[in-house]
Regions:
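Short arginine-rich
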Residues: 152-156, 186
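Glycine-centered loop/turn positions within well-structured domains
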Residues: 147, 155-157, 165
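Conserved acidic donor-binding loop of glycosyltransferase catalytic domains
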Residues: 92-93, 144, 150-151, 167-169
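Beta-rich strand-turn-strand
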Residues: 127-142, 147-151
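Hydrophobic, membrane-inserted alpha-helices
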Residues: 45, 65-67, 143
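Terminal amphipathic alpha-helical/low-complexity segments used for targeting or macromolecular assembly
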Residues: 1-37, 43-44, 82, 97-102, ...
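Flexible, glycine/small-residue-enriched loop-and-beta-strand segment within the central core
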Residues: 51-61, 66-135, 162, 170-171
């Protein structure tokens, strides 16, 4: 087994980091083979305490994906690669309960289709953000803490607010953005070859 030291915190000892890395692999195996067997994963995944994956959802997780504490994944989601998700982030359905049917209580309402949420490569989602189902979060996106994302986000944009809106582009120029997207593609191409 090759341990990836790129993500090692400053000041951490290599031995301690290696032990924690291996323990995480064991914990991930337990989570996705015994506790949440409906979740499919492909690569290194770090799941902090009290994060939950709702039963019956179609959830797939790529390589180098980290979930902070108390995250709640309660909709169909495809997580690609190299994703950081801070604590208390929620992925929720868009149409969990129909509320616009005259003469029917919300409690008794039928459930609508929520769609599949796609989180592309190299995404960072801030603390307590809420992601509504059926959207695509593009490559290289940063989502601010507390944001409520209700629509698709294009590659390399920074979004925040309630509801979330574009704050700015992640990179100053289009050529920097294109260079970064080529870099992401090159990483994925190399991963497929290995």
């Amino acid at each position: 087994m090759k341990i990836d030291y790129h993500n090692m915190p400053k000041g951490a000892g290599m031995t301690t980091f290696a032990i924690r890395y291996i323990m995480n692999i064991v914990r991930t195996w337990y989570l996705f083979h015994l506790k949440y067997p409906w979740v499919k994963y492909n690569g290194f995944v770090r799941v902090m305490a009290h994060t939950t994956f709702a039963r019956g959802m179609k959830i797939s997780i790529g390589h180098n994906v980290q979930f902070g504490e108390y995250c709640n994944i309660a909709s169909d989601v495809v997580f690609k690669n190299n994703i950081l998700i801070a604590g208390r982030v929620c992925f929720v359905g868009r149409n969990d309960h129909q509320f616009d049917t005259v003469g029917e209580l919300i409690w008794n309402s039928s459930r609508g289709y929520n769609g599949i949420t796609i989180v592309e490569d190299d995404v960072w989602i801030g603390h307590s953000a809420t992601i509504v189902g059926g959207i695509t979060i593009g490559k290289g996106v940063v989502i601010a803490a507390g944001a409520v994302v209700t629509q698709d986000i294009q590659d390399c944009e920074i979004w925040g607010g309630v509801p979330a809106k574009k704050i700015k582009d992640r990179f100053s120029t289009i050529s920097e953005k294109e260079h970064h997207l080529r870099y992401i593609k090159r990483i994925q191409d190399n991963k497929r070859k290995n």
